[in-house]
Swiss-Prot record:
Coiled-coil boundaries: none
Entry-linked InterPro entries: Enolpyruvate_Tfrase_dom, Enolpyruvate_Tfrase_sf, MurA_subfamily, RNA3'P_cycl/enolpyr_Trfase_a/b, UDP_GlcNAc_COvinyl_MurA
Pathway: Cell wall biogenesis; peptidoglycan biosynthesis
Active site residues according to the UniProt entry: 117
Keyword Nucleotidyltransferase set for record: no
Name listed for the protein in its UniProt record: UDP-N-acetylglucosamine 1-carboxyvinyltransferase
Species in which this protein is naturally found: Acidithiobacillus ferrooxidans (strain ATCC 23270 / DSM 14882 / CIP 104768 / NCIMB 8455)
């Protein structure tokens, strides 16, 4: 099993291209199942979750072509199966996103209950109750969600909780429903706006994406299209925090500052100089970061996917901070690993108090989920000595060649296959 070895190595400096957003690419890949013609998606990151999704589409019968220019073409016409098997679904929660498209396009779907990061229950009830409101018959048996409907019928759906994947699933299903669907209490994330753009390019009629009320006028069929997914705002934020922690000066290209305003505000509060351009963000940190309080909430508030990274920064910041997680339970699993590096953190329920220390010290640590693993990488960049991070397959699910990108900025980081290669 691969590991990452880091040695604290001073400020990060240089330029970096940001990858396409995994959380935009995954629903767009699922949306290709709705079409009657091939769909081409561009700016797709090379990640484990993307590979798993492509395997799932192929298992369903779709023809998948991958080129060397971050492009993927999916031809859904040969799809012959509506069963998403456990072997693929168990590793990735986003696989539930094929439920709506398969049901809407083929009249039935069987999707194994999903797996993924162990950061809370993330119930699929929002997906199921919404599809039932659209006229689907749904049962859950033998670990599978089984759904059937001759044709879905548009209706008004008030979502019981704000759910990104729930909004995406219902949005996709409603594009082929008969009549108008209104989604209320919908999630507002940029990745949902991007999915709506993709669906609209395929012929869907959607308004209100990016607000809490989305209206979809169902159409008889969707055609082929080409769509480029948005930049990854979480990858962007992660590298910005890395620069802030190391006292660096980096410029990120092919990104969008408008997608992470709450993160940029917190970085400025921490003392960073942030300059934005049309598709660039430059950050310079000339001092030890100031501790900043963080409270996660649905977009446009501070994202839960940046909580662990800011906790890592607060570990070496000047002063004390309070980090509050309101989205998921069990999302402080990185705390004990940061403590192994010398962090002063007291976590209780959904709140953690972080007291900044002068320095962290390297140690063996273990990643528990995607963003927790990112926080350990950030901590390793500033820790004295060597930090060895185990179970980095979590990291590979969401960050494209992170060791190569950080190395290009001057970090001392490398991937190793086993600890025996470290002397």
């Amino acid at each position: 099993m691969d590991k990452l070895l880091l040695r604290g190595n001073g400020p990060l400096r240089g330029e970096l291209r940001i990858s396409g957003a995994k959380n935009a690419a995954l629903p767009c890949l699922a949306a290709t199942l709705l079409a009657r013609e091939p769909v081409r998606l561009c700016n797709i990151p090379h990640l484990r979750d993307i590979t798993t999704t492509l395997e799932l589409l192929s298992t369903l019968g779709a023809r998948v072509l991958v080129d060397g220019q971050l492009g993927i073409e999916v031809d859904p016409r040969p799809v012959h199966s509506v069963v998403a098997p456990y072997e693929l679904v168990k590793t990735m929660r986003a696989s539930i996103l094929v439920l709506g498209p398969l049901l809407a396009r083929h009249g039935s779907a069987e999707v194994s209950l999903p797996g993924g990061c162990a950061i809370g229950s993330r119930p699929v009830s929002v997906h199921l109750s919404g599809l039932q409101a659209l006229g689907a018959e749904i049962t859950v048996e033998d670990g599978f969600v089984k759904a059937q409907a001759a044709r879905l019928r548009g209706t008004r759906i008030v979502m019981e909780m704000v759910s990104v994947t729930g909004t995406e699933n219902l949005l996709m299903a409603a594009t082929l429903a008969e009549g108008r669907t209104i989604l209320e209490n919908a999630a507002r994330e940029p990745e949902i706006v991007d999915l709506a753009r993709c669906l609209s390019a395929m012929g869907a009629r959607i308004s209100g994406a990016g607000t809490s009320v989305i209206e979809i006028e169902g159409v008889a069929e969707l055609h082929g299209a080409e769509h480029s997914v948005v930049p990854d705002r979480i990858e962007t934020g992660t590298y910005l925090v890395a620069a802030a922690m190391t006292g660096g000066d980096i410029c990120l290209k092919r990104t969008d500052a408008g997608l992470l305003e709450s993160v940029l505000l917190k970085l400025k509060e921490a003392g960073a100089e942030v300059t934005t351009g049309a598709d660039t963000i430059r950050i310079r940190m000339k001092r030890r970061p100031r501790a900043v309080d963080v409270r996660t909430a649905p977009f446009p508030a501070f994202p839960t996917d940046m909580q662990a990274q800011f906790m890592a920064m607060n570990c070496i910041a000047e002063g004390s901070s309070v980090v509050t997680e309101t989205i998921f339970e069990n999302r402080f699993m990185h705390v004990s690993e940061l403590q192994r590096l010398g962090a002063d953190i007291n976590a209780d329920g959904k709140t953690a108090v972080v007291r900044g220390v002068q320095r962290l010290r390297g140690a063996p640590v273990m990643a528990t989920d995607l963003r927790a693993s990112a926080s350990l990488v950030l901590a390793g960049l500033v820790a004295e000595g060597e930090t060895l991070i185990d179970r980095i397959y979590h990291l590979d699910r969401g960050y494209e060649v992170i060791e190569e990108k950080l190395s290009a900025l001057g970090a001392d980081i490398r991937r190793i296959s086993n600890t025996r290669s470290v002397a």
